[in-house]
Amino acid sequence: MARAVHRSGLVALGIATALMASCAFAAKNVVVAVGSNFTTLDPYDANDTLSQAVAKSFYQGLFGLDKEMKLKNVLAESYTVSDDGLTYTVKLREGIKFQDGTDFNAAAVKANLDRASDPANHLKRYNLYKNIAKTEAIDPTTVKITLKQPFSAFINILAHPATAMISPAALEKYGKEIGFHPVGTGPYELDTWNQTDFVKVKKFVGYWQPGLPKLDSITWRPVADNNTRAAMLQTGEAQFAFPIPYEQAALLEKNKNIELMASPSIMQRYISMNVTQKPFDNPKVREALNYAINRPALVKVAFAGYATPATGVVPPSIAYAQSYKPWPYDPVKARELLKKAGYPNGFSTTLWSSHNHSTAQKVLQFTQQQLAQVGIKAQVTAMDAGQRAAEVEGKGQKESGVRMFYTGWSASTGEADWALSPLFASQNWPPTLFNTAFYSNKQVDDFLAQALKTNDPAEKTRLYKAAQDIIWQESPWIPLVVEKLVSAHSKNLTGFWIMPDTGFSFEDADLQ
């Protein structure tokens, strides 16, 4: 702050040589405009990718995923798995400290995994860790994690953004308020959180990786309106913005000071239908609604071409994803099916969205118009993060008002189980996880469970295909599109990326 005041004084005096020197040491402060607000800074208690992405400012895990969603070591050096698949032994890096000076060691890992795997803590990400039987600190750099049953995707759970290492001293000090007081091993530490406006983080001078971070601060600013985010880039109010309004992508691409990036994605957009409620308990109704939506037109209208029509319930870039013949747009067929289902004049329903940004609202409007053409009157509501948490994620089947729900999912572990189980397994109805269709099929449950007990790729392929075949046939969803991730940044900002799961990679970020 003193540096900035000193610089402005020199400008006022008009001392050119001093001005040049001060510019050379100008603070590297970056503003990132994002599409919605943050729910918490505790990764274990965040259901949304954005909150977990911002938490990466402070936190790191034992493992992580690179830009290709491949596993990489972070705070861990290596791991081994026992022959029975029940025990994971992890070797840790030495000499790392948390931002409060506490040592990072095996005891810290145990404290975090004990907290995460204890149902009494009621953490939203508990389901990721409920298979942990016990965690033991063998010595300061060795952790042994024993599972209740074999879980072949467990190492990907340890790479999930939720599996952050929090200072055990901070956990002891702040308890349930840790979401407001993040203390990790990451490159930045908390400066300010104005819960209605921004999160600002500043360089952690004791960061363990030499020469990093290169930025002095990052301000994460929620901006719901797509056009405002784009305008902030053009005026220099922000140096990075995501998501970029698709209709403005071409305009931004012409700006010589801005670089536009369209990245591969594992973000699947869909509409779930509550199959426990009429009329969505009728398979013919669900089939009709799939015929009622013109997906190629939706790609153009809402996504300006930056998406592809969905060909399954798992994005193609996820291992073991199955592709099917896309649903054709056939409103005549849709009306015939509705008549056979006992709804010759259609019906009225509600369609909620998990987000309220401009693209989500376009999807709602487009879908509302498409449904109207087959006699379905849908009242639409675009929710903010607080509404979504209260009305969708926080209510069970009996209390839920969810009927049709437009949302998206990215399997942040990079593997098939997390692309399927949270969304279709019977035990994962809200408020447990995100099966907002309240879908239940015993065969699907069995196939998903069996797939986690084998490390044989051929057997996994068979089991995941069998599960997806049933889900596709029973249609608890209207699969819509797989997005392309469109972001933009100032050309002098380097090393700042969007991950395929819509998270951020910014450890090497710098302002030139």
UniProtKB/Swiss-Prot annotation:
Gene3D superfamilies to which the protein is assigned, alphabetical: Dipeptide-binding Protein, Domain 1 (3.90.76.10), Dipeptide-binding Protein, Domain 3 (3.10.105.10), Periplasmic binding protein-like II (3.40.190.10)
Keywords: Periplasm, Signal, Transport
GO cellular component: ATP-binding cassette (ABC) transporter complex; outer membrane-bounded periplasmic space
GO function terms (MF aspect): peptide transmembrane transporter activity
CDD domains, A to Z: PBP2_Ylib_like (cd08499)
Superkingdom field: Bacteria
Signal sequence interval, chain numbering: 1-26
InterPro entries tied to this protein: Peptide/Ni-bd, SBP_5, SBP_5_CS, SBP_5_dom
Pfam assignment, any one: SBP_bac_5
Disulphides: none
Compartmental location: Periplasm
GO biological process, one term: dipeptide transport
Function (record text): Part of the ABC transporter complex GsiABCD involved in glutathione import. Binds glutathione.
Subunit structure as annotated in this protein's UniProt entry: The complex is composed of two ATP-binding proteins (GsiA), two transmembrane proteins (GsiC and GsiD) and a solute-binding protein (GsiB).
Family listed: Belongs to the bacterial solute-binding protein 5 family.
PANTHER family (alphabetical): GLUTATHIONE-BINDING PROTEIN GSIB (PTHR30290:SF32), PERIPLASMIC BINDING COMPONENT OF ABC TRANSPORTER (PTHR30290)
Designated name of the protein: Glutathione-binding protein GsiB
UniProt organism field: Escherichia coli O6:K15:H31 (strain 536 / UPEC)
